[in-house]
Amino acid sequence: MSFDTPLKPYLAIPIQDCGEPLAPINLEGVKSLKPHPYAQVGADYQGRSPYVLRTGVLKRLDQARLTLADIEPSWEILVFDAYRPIAVQQFMVDHTFAEIVARDGLQGQVLTPEQKENIYHQVYQIWAVPNNNPLTPPPHSTGAALDITLLDDLGQPVDMGGEIDELSARSLPNYYQTVEPNSDRQRKEFEQYQRRRELLNTIMESAGFLRHPGEWWHFSQGDQLWAWQYNQRHPDHQKIAYYGRVE
């Protein structure tokens, strides 16, 4: 990291880890990507599986899966990413930085401080800072956060109107409520994207998860981000995080 990044407000939430272990995501109606997309671009998990969660989080994911089955019986949950070691977090920050440099036609060796700061600002819109401080862990390094989407009755990813990890305004959960369509056809598409995102949020919230304010695909339960969001909704019933960094 080449400039001072202000700590996100949720990182001030205290952590009292409950000690639950990680367990494999092995649930009926829940699929995962193989090979893992980050491993495909070179991330080294050192033999560890990214498809693990804290046991309590795993139980809640199963609850969400059952809720989806009630609403869309032939659909399934697709887990894009779950547990992410700090080293992988750092790799993906560096990888995304390099992607932006290439996309914008810049020369990585001669970037000005202002250019670097602008690029890191974009990177940290999506990626948490790969911090080794146990008081401020990245959400995915706690085993309590996961990135997901939906699969249709043919086992194909449902079009959500944007890709996971996309660096654009389309990643905002309610993006399609804020843009004006230019045709009736586009209006129907936008409404469909929004309904699908709301369905994903509905099944996850029904199981106690809360969605990242800036990412339609990211949900967590019991980590600092979750506690911070919960406290915003319930100012008279404050919670702390009970999942911290896990190795």
Curated annotation (Swiss-Prot):
Listed EC numbers: 3.4.13.22
Stretches of the chain forming a coiled coil according to its record: none
An annotated GO BP: proteolysis
Database matches in Pfam families: Peptidase_M15 (PF01427)
Subcellular location: Cytoplasm
Gene3D superfamilies, alphabetized: 3.30.1380.10
Cofactor remark from the record: Binds 1 zinc ion per subunit.
Active site, UniProt feature: 215
Main location: cytoplasm
Residues reported in the UniProt entry to bind Zn(2+): 140, 147, 218
The protein's required cofactors: Zn(2+)
Role summary: Catalyzes hydrolysis of the D-alanyl-D-alanine dipeptide. May have a role in cell-wall turnover.
Protein name, per record: D-alanyl-D-alanine dipeptidase
The species this protein was found in: Synechocystis sp. (strain ATCC 27184 / PCC 6803 / Kazusa)
